[in-house]
Amino acid sequence: MKKIGLIVVGIIVILGGALLYLNHMNYWPFHKDKEKGIPDGEIKNMNQLDRTDELSLLLAASGKVGYNVKGSNVSIYFDVYKRDKRVLHKLVTEFGSEKDTQLSGTLVWGIPGFDVFKPTEIRAAISNDGATSQDSFAIPKDIFGKIDNAGAQTQPFEDGKIKKGKKYILQGWIMGKENIGMNEDTFSEKGFKNQEQTVILYVVFK
């Protein structure tokens, strides 16, 4: 009888742990209105889109991000810096409301073409609870191709708690003779000073 009791207790502990995990990660049967597999208040880097899809082969760069957070706005921007001076700031697309609400969904983006160093357009879509905001942005012709020694990086951030107002880089480019490689400071105010030109596509949560 004691052995049976221990087995029952063990089963209860295992089931309880499994249910707590499912709840924490927003899996079924909990929180059907949230993005599955992502804890509350966090962002998930889903990296590049599935390259087995023939259509994705037409993209020079692409990515996907998942999120569950209380907030009012999800925005994707395109910025250009000359050293540490921002010379261009453009909104690509956004999804938002007048007050804080549950923001749960994904954003996908892509750069049509075959050369990530010669982009002409950015396409992005933000999905939230069945609604989608999508748009395209034509990149000005004088930004790329005029400076040598360019480098590029796709979604260099890690999964974790979302910090409101932080720039989560989707795609970044550095250009100039001073090109010293990429590190955690490359796409920061400190890193901008080391490059002749820096271009970033990023998402911000508010």
Locate each region found by the language model.
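N-terminal Sec-pathway targeting helices
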Residues: 1-15, 19-20
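Short secondary-structure boundary micro-motifs
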Residues: 4, 49-51, 62-63, 157, ...
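N-terminal export/targeting and maturation segments
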Residues: 19-102
